[in-house]
């Protein structure tokens, strides 16, 4: 399908250079970039890591799970989150 888009001269030159380096057409490079952009938007980027409490022990007493500030401080200080059996 043919369409017309407006892009900066600098971006077009960079895309043409990339196409030459890869031995691809300019259209293929633009299509690949657009596919990656749309796929990234669908997935929402990297998922944050969340602490996992093993064997159902739960968090250590005294850690307020409703406070972002407390959780951030505990994680920044590298303290143990799991309670011990």
Curated annotation (Swiss-Prot):
Lineage: Bacteria, Bacillati, Actinomycetota, Actinomycetes, Mycobacteriales
Function recorded in the entry: Antitoxin component of a type II toxin-antitoxin (TA) system. Upon expression in M.smegmatis neutralizes the effect of cognate toxin VapC25.
Gene: vapB25
Superkingdom, taxonomy of origin: Bacteria
CDD domains, per database record: RHH_CopG_NikR-like
Protein name as annotated: Antitoxin VapB25
GO terms of biological process kind: regulation of DNA-templated transcription
SUPFAM superfamilies linked: Ribbon-helix-helix (SSF47598)
Residue segments, region Disordered: 45-65
Keywords for this protein: Toxin-antitoxin system
């Amino acid at each position: 399908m043919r369409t017309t888009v407006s892009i900066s001269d600098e971006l077009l030159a960079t895309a043409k250079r990339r196409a030459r380096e890869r031995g691809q057409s300019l259209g293929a490079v633009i299509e690949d970039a657009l596919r990656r952009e749309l796929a990234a938007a669908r997935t929402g980027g990297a998922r944050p890591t969340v602490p996992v409490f093993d064997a159902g022990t739960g968090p250590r007493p005294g850690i307020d799970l409703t406070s972002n500030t407390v959780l951030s401080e505990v994680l920044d200080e590298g303290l143990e989150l799991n309670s011990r059996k």
